[in-house]
């Protein structure tokens, strides 16, 4: 640095300064705002370090407080409308709410973007429900500080999260100079903030410290994985030269810029320039003329060079730094910003951070633009899921991530974060306290707590186990199942009352239909648990209906397009859900819509009827009569019953393709060979038919020698012994056969036969039981004993069925079955001790001394058995089944509530009538019973006889009572009713309410319910039909009292298998036992690679999961589709028309292009790559060449010499991003430097050759990107001018060598010095470069005691290996040995007197020698 240059002020002062806030609100006036006062722009790095040091000092975790985005707002010189500013503010709100955002603006009140930023902070920050890292940084000069002596600038409101960054200005600087300097400083602030200083330079306290001790904290070192850098983005709406300077700074530093093209005329010109640059007949000179003419009316005619540089910088690579949007796209500003960050920063190795930003801003469009699978590791996926799951408005991004099927693994931290961002009242009050009995909120999900959650979920789902596996939370990698993780996340979200997330995760589960039904059952149970909080109950019931409806819709969608696939799902066992099939799980979860579906009803009927089919003969007998007669007489089974033909038998044949792939399997014993096909069944059949005939009649052509050389078909065996087994090697053809009668085991094991046989015996049982009851007197003890035994067998059968079903279905789902067994048992006990074997002592204790009580119990038993028979057997009828359900619904919903209401009226009326009508009657149990009896019977009759005055009462009339408390009713007989007016009114009131109000209300309720429950009754009836089929599947083949024979035969079958089929449980005709262990494909043309693991039903589950994803996607997009088809078609036509106009223009101008516009190619040295031949006109970077896209080439590192390979920049796909990031970091470090030698970078982040375009991108044959230095050494010897000589090589050139290392010691110079006789110590001393390696000008002199080499020049040189991103640079160093002893004769080198150097060496080298002599005083 020259001594005459002023030393920049590097001071930094944190302070609180007063500012003048202008506005109409209450914030107008003087405000005190925290500020950082910079002495000069060169003090900016210190300010950045101060900011991040303060953040690190107050942080409780790594990178806390570091923003995700830094948005610079540029609108200097513009004026926006209130509506436009409101649109921009709404676009910025998504950033402030979704992620950590720092806004940078000028802060001036006449800057519209500054007002937008201030308004956004005031409207968003007070309403946030989570901690937000939001900061508004105002960068300006010290004119913003309020002062009495100068006119201070008015600033925007600084009351919320605002920091001033003030730079002192020079007193003599003009306004334009200060404005340009502040514009560059504002842009440099964003660039430097986007590159935080290394953690080694930031002090972080080990414990909480006061603000006064922040600066004394110790330093820490973080690993590169913890290096978080915010993404800088600029939003431009400027209309001045200063705004263009700031915009150019951003583009030159590779920061994406979003220009609001309709905000001002300058932005419109920029948009037009961008469009013109894409035209086919672009001409640079015409463009400059057009641009100047457009800028002149705006007073910006001298700014065309800035726009030209802007366009060159933004188009110097394959990255688009500038994006134009209009006001209609401001609502999607977050998506635009994320897309720009993806294109600009993903190439620098920051894809993970871009993906996390997209998750925070709910912008799933980036997922289709990058290889997410390569970036989604467990840590990043956990962070993304936490961002998405904790917010209901980010379901779109969550569904987009789940569509990629990432390897999800649930962690305790993830679930705890979800809990803290959810409705903690529901979770703590209902789930933890009420359901689990916890009195505290857990801080982690340990196995014990996870086990308690599993028990709760099992209880809520009525027995479905392993839905919340505690083993998932261990560190064992074997439990990392993504489908299990999705199930756990869905259940946890349900427990946190997050309905939207539950529906999304259910749609992406492995078995969406089954899992949705289970979640629906859990939601319904949670709704029941939260009955006291009606809003929770309503929300959970709605969620339950939505999940059940989603499962039904998905199932119906598949059934309408592919009924076979839907039916196959019903026959497929599900290992994660108790091994149930779909229908069983639907019954378990009370999913009536699924069971009522047509496909499920087909499955239920197949389960009920099996393969049994009744003949049409005789016609006059209905089917049920044929089944009953056949079941009783057995012989008609052979004549009236048939076995329904099975589906076409799928033989376990293997296709030739699979046989080709299955190398480990032996070929068939017989083969068919044909010259026309591999398998010729026709030739094989002809051979089988003609061979015996030709042998018998002597027409064997083979014996006569007339056979063809290539026979059309022949069959030969590999094993002669197996010829007689099957002469046709390719299987037998199916033949049409008559249906045969079923076997007795098939007939009696069919549920429909069990049903009709059981109903027949049940009717006989009821008749016999009724006969035993109506026998006079004590009846027949023998008959009663027989009927009790028969009843006991019925009870045993019911217990057996209930026990069998209770193995998988909890008893709480079968309350009627449990009640039936219990009531039956009570009646059996009472009849046993009262009638069959009377236990006299017990009866005497109970006060029962007559057989009448036994007859009463028997009568009620007959009633109960009759009604239970009605409800048990009636669901099979399609007429009476729905009717009984309707009656049941009316009774439960209307009549029960009516009874509660009328009971209140009856009891209150009974009290009032007793008090007013019979005031003197004593209150006894007999009186109470008679009063209630009259009140109850008044529902059906109107008996007023006991309320009228009888003759007896008239005779006992006393008149007015003499004493107040005696004979209040004026009758001597207390049982006489009072005839007063109040008594009349009380009675009339009761009958009016009872007869005129309550009965019509009940009828109205019945009428309304009967109309509304048709669909529900039909579903319930179909639901009961499945239960009926399941019950009779489990019943023994013969009903009571023949059940004992079934038990005896079952015991015999344990020793003999002769009748095993007769007593086997009939499960389902379409569900075979081998289906439980085989894979889902049933075709012999699919080869399964044995080395690849497959899960059972993997492909079927994948099919349903994809359909569920599509259904979820379509459901979410229905509300977003606003444009109709005609508008879309019109836009499509306009797009095609514009494209045709562009192509026509390009076609018409294709023949008029100049030769200079055409691209020619030439071979790049030492390679087979062709590079573009660039003419001299297009070579400078200042000239716009829109279609310039050179090939990218980097010489492989292996092709370099071994000593150079360690310096080569590896430009692989994995490493090129890191190279770009390093170059951007170098550029950011030089933002405040005044050195004009700073390299320019392309939009992609590679350095640009100062010589201009070369026609080749990459580093080419150079080992490094950027400058590849070749050092030239001017070694002088001699202390005076007459003896001065210089060292040259054999080619009479100054010694030179490529210098690729960056150390301060020059090893090649050391070897040269040693070669000419300098000692080792002196050679090392002369080779050590200065710390300040600036170029020494000719007017300076080096002292004689200075031994460091002098840096004479550093110049860019032309080289055939140069590319756009790598070039040659000559670095010249000089050293004077003066009077040191040297060797005069050196191999490869020689000493040349400086007086004879002209004409001997190259002129530019001679100039360097004389320059070296000058600075050394020679």
Swiss-Prot record:
It is a multi-pass membrane protein. It comes from the Eukaryota. InterPro entries: TRPM. GO terms for molecular function: monoatomic cation channel activity. GO terms for biological process: apoptotic process; metal ion transport; monoatomic cation transmembrane transport. Pfam families: TRPM2. Disulfide bonds: none annotated. The chain crosses the membrane at residues 617-637, 755-775, 782-802, 818-838, 856-876, 898-918, 986-1006. It is found in: Membrane. Keywords: Apoptosis, Membrane, Transmembrane, Transmembrane helix. GO terms for cellular component: plasma membrane. Plays a major role in programmed cell death. This is Protein ced-11. It comes from Caenorhabditis elegans.
